Amino acid sequence: MAKKKSTISPLYVHDKPKSTISEKFRGIRSNIMFSNAENEIKSLLITSEKSASGKSILSANIAVTYAQAGYKTLIIDGDMRKPTQHYIFDLPNNSGLSNLIINKTTYSDSIKETRVENLNVLTAGPTPPNPSELIASSKFATIFNELLNHYDFIVIDTPPINTVTDAQVYARIVKNCVLVIDAEKNNKSEVKKAKGLLTKAGGKVLGAVLNKMPIDKNSSYYYYYGED
């Protein structure tokens, strides 16, 4: 099993389902579901403008909310540079997305069950020397489309978009995006840059989540829509 990082927050929605923050996560899920009235959203890219914004914890908890709602859900750790989901779910990471793209493993060996019903995790796998090139390959597009046919909903946790190009490459395929912003430490120009990069790549920014927002003492997540 994965050695846990002491800084990793719990799966609030699963472990503390009646907490205020769990309700906030469910509210975010509802906003995502109703953000596109014409077409059902089946996949979601979650990124941030910088590191340490809380995107991985958000990704995990959003995935749990979909699983709890009865959706057969998969969370993909798309951050092959600094993977986190295997720590959050306490899973091995010897086999995952990176191996799958280069045909060194199978779906059954890479996709792991979790303690959450209806939720599987595709961990990042060993860090490759060329993450962006692997993501841009036709093999990844094939993998993603095959997984869409197998799951009701897919969440992809990606690296910060202003740091490396990985999230832009994912956005070309996944399309629907949510940007996580640190409410305490952010730069308006960097946030605009992040949104611009997602849009330029072909992504549709559904909205943003302000993390560390002091709404009340029990909650730190707030979802909003907006063009600016």
Curated annotation (Swiss-Prot):
Group of enzyme by EC: transferase
EC number of this enzyme: 2.7.10.2
Pathway per the UniProt entry: Capsule biogenesis; capsule polysaccharide biosynthesis
Keyword ATP-binding set for record: yes
Disulfide cysteine pairs (residue numbers): none
GO CC annotations on file: plasma membrane
Family per record: Belongs to the CpsD/CapB family.
NCBIfam families in alphabetical order: eps_fam
Protein name per Swiss-Prot or TrEMBL: Putative tyrosine-protein kinase CapB
Protein's organism: Staphylococcus aureus
